[in-house]
UniProtKB/Swiss-Prot annotation:
Record gene name: CSM3
GO cellular component: replication fork protection complex
Record's compositionally biased regions (Basic and acidic residues): 16-37
Region (Disordered): 16-44, 330-352
Entry protein name: Chromosome segregation in meiosis protein 3
Cellular localisation: Nucleus
Entry's family note: Belongs to the CSM3 family.
Entry-linked PANTHER family: TIMELESS INTERACTING-RELATED, TIMELESS-INTERACTING PROTEIN
Length: 352
């Protein structure tokens, strides 16, 4: 009986242990963990599947930033700010050394070695000042490397070149103001303001003149309605090919016929007709010369032609009448017959 109980207790213990193992396996499956029985095989399968290393985790370490001389470092308080703040100390040191050297030179003759020593002291002060500055700005580099890095930055950085140019221009302006070449800033601003006021006044006067001229042009075009004759008018109804009528001129034939001089009739001269057979005494015959109005008619003709040609600037009649005037002016009068010839003609006609 005792043996049976022992066997029953052992089997019960085995069942409980199996049940506990089953619960553990169930927990592993639900939690996503690998089965402890098949752990080695699962790891081997995972290594074969992850040949490219996509699922492996890599630990990344952050690199320390490399110290270098850049714009941020050079424009910081330890950079150019330190030089602008403390450069007057270096100037005072050099002035003090110069003053001591002048006092020594007044007492007696200065040797050449003393001059070199004075210059060496000044250069040593400058070198120590810049060594201290470089060490505070870039501690990891010695002075020689720091100078090399600063030269490279000055050649590459546009911001640093512009800043250096501004400093140089400011110093030049200060020297010019001290020497009286240029006026100070306040006087310069006042001069510029006065100049701007004058320029504005001149511009305003010019604008007023232009506006007045434009108004006059508008009024003149509205009243006239036409252009000045040099260009085609704005009116579309104008005839582009319209020509002015020709001026009234005197016909050349009429002018010539009006000034032709006819031979004087004997009856007009003697006062005796052809039918009168009365003997006329020579003493009773009174021959009066007839005035030939050649010049008067020609002058009247030229005056009329000139007055008519004045209306036409491109008239061709001027040449014709000028030549005609010259012809009749220079025409010689026919020689008058003497009294003796006239008497002979009268006697012949009477049959004597």
């Amino acid at each position: 009986m005792s043996g049976f109980l022992d066997d029953y207790s052992e089997s019960l213990e085995q069942f409980e242990s199996f049940r506990a193992d089953d619960q553990d396996v169930h927990q592993h499956i639900t939690s996503g963990e690998h089965d402890p029985v098949d752990g080695d095989s699962n790891v081997a399968d995972a290594e074969q599947d992850d040949l490219l290393g996509l699922d492996t985790q890599i630990k990344l370490t952050k690199r320390k930033p490399t110290a270098r001389v850049d714009n941020n470092r050079i424009f910081s308080q330890k950079g150019l700010g330190y030089l602008l703040k403390n450069h007057h100390k270096l100037s005072k040191t050099i002035q003090r050394n110069d003053k001591q050297f002048e006092e020594k030179s007044k007492n007696g003759r200065v040797h050449r070695a003393q001059k070199f020593q004075h210059e060496y002291d000044n250069l040593s002060s400058v070198l120590q000042f810049y060594q201290l500055w470089c060490h505070g700005m870039f501690p990891k580099a010695n002075f020689k490397d720091c100078v090399h890095l600063l030269r490279l930055l000055g050649a590459k950085s546009p911001r640093l070149r512009l800043y250096r140019r501004e400093l140089i221009e400011q110093e030049i302006i200060k020297l010019k103001e001290a020497s009286g070449i240029i006026v100070e800033q306040e006087e310069r601003e006042n001069t510029l303001q006065a100049g701007n006021i004058i320029v504005d006044a001149e511009n305003q006067e010019t604008e007023d003149i232009i506006e007045a001229s434009n108004i006059n042009n508008v009024v003149s075009t509205e009243t006239s309605g036409e252009t000045n004759g040099l260009f085609v008018g704005d009116n579309d109804d104008d005839d582009l090919y319209h020509t002015p009528p020709p001026p009234e001129t005197v016909s050349p034939n009429i002018a010539v016929s009006s000034i032709v001089v006819s031979k004087p009739d004997l009856a007009d001269i003697t006062g005796v007709s052809d039918t009168d057979t009365t003997i006329v005494d020579k003493s009773e015959v009174n021959i009066q010369p007839i005035a030939i109005p050649v010049l008067t008619q020609v002058s009247d003709l030229t005056n009329t032609t000139n007055n008519e040609s004045d209306h036409d600037a491109f008239s061709d009649d001027d040449d014709f009448y000028a030549s005609l005037n010259e012809t009749f002016v220079h025409q010689e009068r026919p020689p008058q017959e003497s009294d003796y010839d006239a008497e002979e003609e009268v006697m012949k006609e009477m049959g004597l």
